[in-house]
Design a protein with these regions (language model features):
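Short glycine/threonine-rich loop-to-helix capping motif typified by GTGT followed
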Residues: 88-99, 125-142, 160-168, 201
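A glycine- and small-aliphatic-rich helix-loop capping segment at beta-alpha/alpha-beta transitions
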Residues: 21-35, 97-99, 133-145
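Glycine-rich phosphate/pyrophosphate-binding beta-alpha loops
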Residues: 125-127, 156-162, 218-224
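Beta-strand segments within the central parallel beta-sheet cores of soluble alpha/beta enzyme folds
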Residues: 4-13, 74-82, 115-122, 148-155, ...
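Conserved beta-strand-centric core segments of catalytic alpha/beta enzyme folds
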Residues: 1-67, 164-225
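Stable alpha-helical structural segments in soluble proteins, enriched in small hydrophobic residues
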Residues: 102-110, 137, 141, 172, ...
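Short beta-alpha connecting loops at secondary-structure transitions
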Residues: 46, 87, 152-158
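Condensing-enzyme catalytic core mediating Claisen C-C bond formation in acyl metabolism
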Residues: 36-110, 118-119
Length: 225
């Protein structure tokens, strides 16, 4: 845009010592409980019952492609497009129609079509209603395509709040090099309402032809997509 040469973008969250976060999710019935903590975060599974709060951080350096090439930078990805919108309906419950709109507009902004998306990094937080609503949006955009793979990083690391989007994208960037979409783990009993044709269940999957495009979903409270 001609306003800056380099920008830092990402997120950092120190959440696990913040009592209010746990109390808030608990009061909403959205905090996960499981006898085995390693299996508590289980997006799309029938037994999912809430968020596993985690923390971490990830920061990206953003610059013009020509500038990065000129300094011989190690380029991990190119930002093709983005979109942000608001559900405008409920403090907690998502609106799949607005999520779908956000996804479609992001793809359009990138100059692509849904069939050109190789991998979707889903936002699903392991909550009963949130996961189902996102799946409705994804199903409306990608239909029954098996060519667009869909996975979830929170199944491994939980929900790192404001850092989640940046961290989950980082978890999928290696796909550009090796062509593998990492799995969505802890999927022992897939909820039919969350069934997606391209869902990568429990084991990583290599995509024929490689992975060249990633759509990274981040849908926050207050309906901010």
């Amino acid at each position: 845009l001609g306003e800056c040469d380099v920008a830092l973008a990402g997120g950092v969250s120190e959440s696990i010592r913040a009592y209010g976060i746990f109390a808030g999710f608990k009061s909403q019935g959205a905090l996960a409980a499981h006898e085995d903590p390693t299996q508590a975060s289980r997006p799309f599974d029938r037994g999912r019952n809430g968020i596993v709060v985690s923390e971490g951080g990830c920061i990206y350096v953003l610059e013009r492609l020509n500038d990065a090439l000129a300094r011989d930078a190690h380029i991990v990805a190119e930002v093709l497009g983005y979109r942000i919108n608001s559900d405008g309906t409920d403090y907690v419950l998502p609106n799949p129609e607005r999520q779908e709109e956000c996804i479609r507009q992001a793809i359009e902004n990138a100059g692509l079509s849904p069939s050109m998306i190789d991998l979707v990094s889903s936002h699903a937080t392991s909550t009963p209603q949130g996961d189902e609503q996102e799946c409705k949006a994804l199903r409306n955009v990608f239909g029954d395509s098996t060519e667009t793979l869909i996975n979830n990083t929170k199944s491994f690391i939980g929900h790192s709040m404001g850092a989640a989007g940046a961290i989950e994208l980082a978890g999928n960037l290696p796909s550009f090099a090796d062509g593998y979409a990492h799995a969505t783990i802890n999927l022992d009993d897939l909820d039919p309402s969350c069934a997606l044709s391209g869902l990568v269940e429990n084991e990583a999957k290599k995509k024929a032809g490689g992975i060249e495009t990633i759509l990274n979903n981040s849908f926050g409270m207050l309906g901010i997509n």
